[in-house]
Amino acid sequence: LNFVPKFTYTIFMGGFFGAASQTDCVFDLFFGIDYHSHLGTRRAGMAVYSPETGFDKAIHNIENAPFRTKFTTESQSMHGTLGIGCISDYEAQPILVRSHHGTFAITTIGKINNANEIVEDIIGRGTHFFEMQNGEVNPTELVAAIIDQKENFIDGIRYAQEVVNGSLSMLVLTPRGIYAARDKLGRTPVVLGQKEDGYCASFESFAYLNLGYHDLRELGPGEVVVFDADHVQTLVAPGKKMKICTFLWVYYGYPSSSYEGISVESMRYNCGRALARRDNVHPDIVAGVPDSGIAHAIGYAN
């Protein structure tokens, strides 16, 4: 009866995508999530909201088959004007929650270093958790529980960013729109795209370009916005302290991505050049391991 699940997490990367459209958003959502497949190989999910039918959700294991194959059926059967989804290297998400805020879906990216303390505090207030895996609470459900400690989504999201020791970016899907919040120190990116009939929020800046969107802007550290098909509203202004994860450029990021206006491919090329200057050798051949190693190798060779 006194069992409290313990977290022993290492860092798990992932990516998310959210879309709001005046028409059906599922096509954009499906391919927007698929463009994040390089960020995870274990689980993926998508959740949509339709004014006519309400919420719908699907989660699949993608260890033995890619996202596009596993979610082909859902891409044809699910419908909605608002949707979020993710590629996750750890927990099953997005999850659906019903609380005093109403029904909402949430997906997160990050690492909660003080999860044990937060779980103990919330359980001590009489709350329980449903999503368990290997004896551990689903981190995304934990974030939802933190948000539910406050009276509204804005205060709840700010509270989650405040109490989490680590990194936390999220998308929250509600009937009124999608909340997008970037980590308080900007460790992981969140970028907004726009097209004629809607908006999107994405981890990767290139994920929506083939879907007809153009760059709107990147969220700043700790910034929170809410958007629907017609507008984007800033709820929490960005902070000034930026500590974006440099490993995005070195390894995680797709070659055509850019973060804070800096191209991943250019950064890797320049890193390769810097390594060559440091080593002061004249090799006969330089080989790069795809994908992240190619630009490093070209920079090193040149």
Model feature map: region roles:
Residues 294-302:
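Carboxylate/His-rich catalytic cores and anion/metal-binding grooves
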Residues 2, 6-9:
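Short, positively charged and aromatic/hydrophobic N-terminal segments
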Residues 9-221, 226-284, 289:
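Conserved short alpha-helical segments that host acidic/polar catalytic motifs at enzyme active sites
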